[in-house]
């Protein structure tokens, strides 16, 4: 066989649903790569003969290989920090109170408007490096800290540039409807007009976004405004998604499902009718335990209902300066289990196959299947559950991206 590389002495957590074992596991396995794709995988005993003198062979020392991790919800590009708001919350101020007093997202908007692209790129690069060291091979990055045309475009340009200069694949999301900017505080409908008539066309003209998102909440955009933005995005051929039911149940998830959104995110206050709507539309539920933890929330998403209705559950970091300044997907695995009561297998699926579904890229990544992109990680663990079980010592030993060893 003519391959570019072969990995032996490994176990595979393929996350392939066609394999009935937990994690889609194949023990005592091997995996071969050719032209950036998975060319063969299976039990080591069935590995076809190949020229060991001409093909690089990597020995996994009994570790586990998983698909590359996918962080499907981040706000990774921003300037400044909000440590002062952290102190205010510890003193009793709520997220909503801080936002309504001019803090929250708006304080980060000011910092991002003042920062240039070079500064934002370097900050983003450092954060992307941190995720990559934990086995992340694909990340979604949202705008939303500009809230004017110039700065929204600036953030999205930086995100696109990061994708060109880093081995991690970057999917971009336009989130101009993240908050009402100060200059439109008494004219939110006017700001929605700006998003639809000026921002969105400018984003499309430069091909800066793969999807469009809206923060549908009582401190941000109502249902009618949300539908206007999402409908305009859909009409332009972009994928849509939604921040919904984080603080209250406004019916955003049902709206997103009706419009064919790829995902709804947060969903702590999602009810059974909303879960059913997601199930019927095939919309993913993105769980963000970092924000739940950092904001000290008490109502968890309806995990049992999501299981009952077969809604794909995704885990993501929601890395951002205000509600989840936690740049770690491995910690999300642990939090997903300890806070939201996911099983370790559900948690890992939420950072691989289901995360790929939320981004519409499941045909190419998210599981170890012949023909898919060779994005995978070797972990120094005895069982896949260890990834969610402990935190603090990074067990990621090797990362292969597009068939190339990028971290060792």
UniProtKB/Swiss-Prot annotation:
Gene behind the chain: hutI
Keyword hit for Glycoprotein: no
UniProt family annotation: Belongs to the metallo-dependent hydrolases superfamily. HutI family.
GO cellular component: cytoplasm
Organism lineage: Bacteria, Pseudomonadati, Pseudomonadota, Gammaproteobacteria, Alteromonadales
Catalysed transformations (reactions): 4-imidazolone-5-propanoate + H2O = N-formimidoyl-L-glutamate
Cofactor: how and how many bound: Binds 1 zinc or iron ion per subunit.
Localization per Swiss-Prot or TrEMBL: Cytoplasm
Residues engaged in binding Zn(2+): 73, 75, 243, 318
The protein, known as: Imidazolonepropionase
Pathways per UniProt: Amino-acid degradation; L-histidine degradation into L-glutamate; N-formimidoyl-L-glutamate from L-histidine: step 3/3
């Amino acid at each position: 066989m003519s391959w570019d590389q072969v990995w032996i002495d490994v176990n595979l957590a393929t996350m392939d649903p066609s394999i009935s074992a937990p994690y889609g596991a194949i023990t005592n396995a091997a995996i071969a790569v050719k032209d950036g794709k998975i060319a063969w995988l299976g039990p080591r005993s069935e590995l076809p003969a190949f020229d060991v003198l001409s093909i690089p062979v990597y020995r996994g020392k009994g570790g586990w290989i998983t698909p590359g991790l996918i962080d499907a919800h981040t706000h990774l590009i921003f300037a400044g920090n909000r440590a002062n708001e952290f102190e205010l919350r510890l003193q009793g101020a709520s997220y909503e109170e801080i936002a309504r007093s001019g803090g929250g997202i708006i304080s980060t908007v000011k910092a991002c408007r003042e920062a240039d692209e070079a500064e934002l790129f370097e900050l983003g690069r450092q954060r992307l490096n941190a995720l990559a060291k934990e086995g992340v091979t694909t990340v979604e990055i949202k705008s939303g800290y500009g809230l004017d045309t110039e700065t929204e475009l600036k953030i999205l340009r930086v995100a696109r540039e990061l994708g060109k200069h880093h081995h991690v694949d970057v999917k971009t999301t336009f989130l101009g409807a993240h908050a009402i900017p100060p200059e439109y505080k008494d004219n939110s409908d006017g700001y929605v007009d700006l998003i639809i008539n000026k921002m969105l066309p400018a984003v499309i003209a430069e091909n800066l976004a793969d999807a469009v998102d809206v923060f549908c909440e009582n401190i941000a955009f109502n249902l009618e405004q949300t539908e206007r933005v999402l409908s305009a995005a859909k009409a332009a051929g972009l994928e849509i998604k939604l921040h919904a039911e984080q603080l209250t149940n406004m019916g955003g998830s049902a709206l997103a499902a009706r419009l064919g959104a790829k995902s709804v995110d947060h969903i702590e206050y999602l009810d059974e009718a909303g879960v059913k709507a997601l199930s019927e539309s095939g919309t993913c539920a993105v769980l963000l335990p970092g924000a739940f933890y950092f904001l000290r929330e008490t109502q968890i998403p309806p995990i049992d209902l999501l299981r009952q209705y077969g809604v794909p559950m995704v885990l993501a970091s929601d890395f951002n300066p205000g509600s989840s300044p936690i740049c770690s997907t491995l910690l999300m695995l642990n939090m997903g289990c300890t806070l939201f009561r996911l099983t370790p297998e559900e948690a890992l699926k939420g950072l691989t196959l289901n995360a790929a579904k939320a981004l519409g890229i499941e045909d190419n990544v998210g599981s170890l299947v012949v023909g898919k992109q060779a994005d995978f990680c070797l972990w120094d663990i005895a069982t896949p559950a260890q990834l969610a079980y402990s935190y603090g010592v990074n067990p990621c030993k090797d990362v292969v991206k597009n068939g190339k060893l990028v971290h060792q």
